[in-house]
Amino acid sequence: MMIIVMLILSYLIGAFPSGLIIGKLFFKKDIRQYGSGNTGATNSFRVLGRPAGFIVTFLDIFKGFITVFFPLWFSVHADGVISTFFTNGLIVGLFAILGHVYPIYLKFNGGKAVATSAGVVLGVNPILLLILAIIFFSVLKIFKYVSLSSIIAAISCVIGSIIIHDYILLAVSGIVSIILIIRHKSNIVRIFKGEEPKIKWM
């Protein structure tokens, strides 16, 4: 029972719409009506500016990061294969990612999973996050597309999990990669059409 409560709480925390709340509280803007219409960090930068964008990014990362430690904080007794699986920090963090992407508060239409996924990886393996961040910013420096950089970093995580034989990480990163590609489908189309806006700060 406690495992179910933990997973639901992780989802609900992940579903907290940081960008929407910051936009409405401090800018009187619903960021869903501007830019890409997304509630995540990238659109927050675009619509609300850098300071607010950094705050939203921090909050979205923190959502994923904190949930990784739920199995340590909750009195969870894992006495079998299934219970052990669902008390793994990566799996608990995955529920936060799902909450961020499909928030119950916003009719299941949320962000694109990038920052919250980074928070989960930070909590589980900071060195891996550093490697993925280097890949992300390297691709961003070359191509100037946040969407492309995010997808390549996610796929790199899948490849890395195969190399280190971490199959739970493989499962989670595989799911996240699929979600990222689906959520960035319109961005991918615009990239091929040459219509995707490029960042200007790098």
UniProtKB/Swiss-Prot annotation:
Give the record's pathway. Lipid metabolism; phospholipid metabolism
Which residues span the membrane? 2-22, 54-74, 81-101, 120-140, 162-182
Q: Name one Pfam family in it.
A: G3P_acyltransf
Q: What is this protein called?
A: Glycerol-3-phosphate acyltransferase
Query: Which HAMAP family does the record associate with it?
Result: PlsY
Q: What class of enzyme is it?
A: transferase
GO terms for CC? plasma membrane
According to the record's subunit comment, the protein's assembly and interactions are: Probably interacts with PlsX.
Superkingdom classification of source: Bacteria
Question: EC no.?
Answer: 2.3.1.275
Q: Which organism is it from?
A: Staphylococcus epidermidis (strain ATCC 12228 / FDA PCI 1200)
